[in-house]
Amino acid sequence: MNRTVQKLLPWLTASAQDVEKVRNESIRLDPILMVAVLALLAWGLVMVTSASMELGERFGNPFFFVIRQTIAVVIGASITVWLVLRQPIALWVEYKLWILIASLLLLLVVLLPGIGHSVNGANRWIPLGPVNIQVSEFARLGLIIWMAGYIATHTIKLQNRITGMLGPGVVIFAASLLLLLQPDFGTTAVLAATLFAMAWLARAQWQMMVGSTLVMGVLGVFVVLSEQYRIERLLSFSNPFADPFGHGYQLANALIAIGTGGVWGRGLGESIQKLSYLPEAHTDFIFAVLAEELGLIGVIALIGLYGLIVWRGFVIANMAWKENQIAGAALAWGISVWIGMQALINMGVNMGVLPTKGLTLPLMSYGGSAMIVALISLGFLMRVHHEAAMVAELREAQMTKRQQDASIRTKEVLS
């Protein structure tokens, strides 16, 4: 316990009584964040049920997918409660190198013949009994944790030397290359943007940031132009109704769903497009089903909930930064940017603003790996809030004690 407190508060000394009092209290949860997360979780299960019942009939149970999704929620919540919330961020930072190695190995192993499982031409899954694990989800969280640890241990170097971004640049390039070999362009874009955003928020040298961004941009353009299907995606998303039964089929049906939803929607469970017209209605395109059933009002409410999560994430990051909890602040930045960016991209794809990326809507779309990782990530965010609040309380306790000691000494002098 003392070692943990020392890692959390290397600059602060507090009485053993104060430390024990604060440590024995329950985890300090952000109430607004908790409400937003629980609301999205409950809403997501309802929408998965609505969007997948027709497809579930093919497996002999209309609730086939929501049952599996509920199991993923239970697993993710259990890991969060019994592991993530109970361990200090300093512990994860201490093992950041091993987390980095494990993350890159996951991205490499999935490419090996006989290990990785291919779906629609993409090697993104590793079979594990009756389920398939999407390794990029876990690797992304691992890389965000590593980046947070790197920022915490190299803050001065990042802020004052151009070479400060060299290590992260190499890691981002290696991870992006492995992801593109799957291929998974959407996750590559989100991961690279998230890690760069973390460095930028930590005030990294802009010259290296610009250089790394240009290199990644050139690589991205090359990857897009190297495959005919990616070029066709770019062309079809700009006008899906030019080929509504070919490359534009999925987006055309998504736009029909969103358009027919209007302001108030058709009503929960009343979507027409989910009835085998819209592919991936319960996964990547669940937003279109939501817009059709709940209309513009539902869309605004959904955006509002994601906005609350991102806002609270940055508030928590600011709390941690002020209390000199650099790793916690960086981790909160990364998780907030990732969730907000992925939600915006998914909604943009559904509305035809962006080309199809194959990204799920966090906490809403069907997907066990994505759900488990999202809950674990939000658990880290809550842990950062707890530690920042704990440090603030210890600091205030120390200030109060100093004031009391000063008052006692003053009285003794006057007497």
Swiss-Prot record:
Pathway: Cell wall biogenesis; peptidoglycan biosynthesis. It is a multi-pass membrane protein. It is found in: Cell inner membrane. The chain crosses the membrane at residues 31-51, 63-83, 97-117, 133-153, 162-182, 185-205, 206-226, 245-265, 285-305, 326-346, 361-381. InterPro entries: Cell_cycle_FtsW-rel_CS, FtsW, FtsW/RodA. One of its GO terms (biological process) is peptidoglycan biosynthetic process. It holds the Pfam family FTSW_RODA_SPOVE. GO terms for cellular component: cell division site; plasma membrane. It comes from the Bacteria. Its main location: membrane. Its EC number is 2.4.99.28. It catalyses: [GlcNAc-(1->4)-Mur2Ac(oyl-L-Ala-gamma-D-Glu-L-Lys-D-Ala-D-Ala)](n)-di-trans,octa-cis-undecaprenyl diphosphate + beta-D-GlcNAc-(1->4)-Mur2Ac(oyl-L-Ala-gamma-D-Glu-L-Lys-D-Ala-D-Ala)-di-trans,octa-cis-undecaprenyl diphosphate = [GlcNAc-(1->4)-Mur2Ac(oyl-L-Ala-gamma-D-Glu-L-Lys-D-Ala-D-Ala)](n+1)-di-trans,octa-cis-undecaprenyl diphosphate + di-trans,octa-cis-undecaprenyl diphosphate + H(+). Keywords: Cell cycle, Cell division, Cell inner membrane, Cell membrane, Cell shape, Cell wall biogenesis/degradation, Glycosyltransferase, Membrane, Peptidoglycan synthesis, Transferase, Transmembrane, Transmembrane helix. One of its GO terms (molecular function) is peptidoglycan glycosyltransferase activity. Belongs to the SEDS family. FtsW subfamily. NCBIfam families: ftsW. Peptidoglycan polymerase that is essential for cell division. This is Probable peptidoglycan glycosyltransferase FtsW.
